[in-house]
Structure formats: structure tokens, C-alpha cells
């Protein structure tokens, strides 16, 4: 059980953020605030969410994309991170697993995920 002061602090951290509902298998576009020296810029990172873990302030998710030269790039983001400017859900994926780590071994068409019918 957490201390009530810690719970209040964590609740304040969560209140200001507007996070869309997404799951593993969804294709996301993240706008990440990057600080280089005294300048800041926004960089987009688009990929498939392959896992979510934790809850509350400690919740994180992993996004995987295929970069240049067919190299897989995975990044782990805290959901309530200050560096995340926005999270946009581009596609809803139809998957039967909560963790899609098997996509690491797949290449090309085998790594595709079916789109969820509405």
C-alpha cells in the first residue's frame, strides 16, 4: 500500500495528461519533444505498440517500427512522460495477445497485423 502523499502526488501528475485509449497491436504516431542544446523540436515516431506494462504514473509502453535498412527500432515510453507531446492512434490492430514480442522475429508481410473491424 502506498503512502497517501505519494498517491496524491501521482494523481496530480496524471490529471494534466490527455492519453487516448490504445492497446497492443495498435499503430501509433508519437510526437516527441527533443531538446538539443537550448532549442527544442518535435520529432514524430510511428510504429506498432507491442506491449504495455505497469499502472498509474509508472505505466509504460513499447513502440516498434522498422527503420532504415530494415532495422527494427523499439522505444519504451512512460505514458505520462513530459517529453511526449501527443499520442495519436492511426489504426486499431486485431491481435490475440497482450505482448507482441514475436514480431521481433518476423520480417516483411509476416510482421503485418490485421486491422480491427468496427
From Swiss-Prot:
Short name of one Pfam family: Ribosomal_L19
GO molecular function, one term: structural constituent of ribosome
GO term, biological process aspect, one: translation
Keyword Zinc-finger among UniProt keywords: no
Keyword set, alphabetical order: Ribonucleoprotein, Ribosomal protein
PROSITE patterns: RIBOSOMAL_L19 (PS01015)
InterPro entries from the UniProt entry: Ribosomal_bL19 (IPR001857), Ribosomal_bL19_CS (IPR018257), Ribosomal_bL19_sf (IPR038657), Translation_prot_SH3-like_sf (IPR008991)
Recorded GO CC terms: cytosolic large ribosomal subunit
PANTHER family assigned to the protein according to its UniProt record, in alphabetical order: LARGE RIBOSOMAL SUBUNIT PROTEIN BL19M, RIBOSOMAL PROTEIN L19
Function text: This protein is located at the 30S-50S ribosomal subunit interface and may play a role in the structure and function of the aminoacyl-tRNA binding site.
Protein name per UniProt: Large ribosomal subunit protein bL19
Origin species: Campylobacter lari (strain RM2100 / D67 / ATCC BAA-1060)
Amino acid at each position: 500500500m502506498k503512502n497517501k502523499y505519494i498517491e496524491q502526488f501521482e494523481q496530480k501528475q496524471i490529471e494534466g495528461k490527455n492519453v487516448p485509449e490504445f492497446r497492443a497491436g495498435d499503430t501509433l504516431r508519437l510526437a516527441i519533444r527533443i531538446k538539443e542544446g537550448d532549442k527544442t523540436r518535435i520529432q514524430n515516431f510511428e510504429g506498432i505498440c507491442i506491449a504495455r506494462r505497469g499502472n498509474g504514473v509508472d505505466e509504460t509502453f513499447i513502440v516498434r517500427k522498422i527503420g532504415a535498412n530494415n532495422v527494427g527500432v523499439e522505444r519504451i515510453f512512460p505514458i505520462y512522460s513530459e517529453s511526449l507531446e501527443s499520442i495519436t492512434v492511426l489504426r486499431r490492430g486485431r491481435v490475440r495477445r497482450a505482448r507482441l514480442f514475436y514480431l521481433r522475429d518476423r520480417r516483411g508481410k509476416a510482421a503485418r497485423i490485421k486491422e480491427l473491424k468496427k
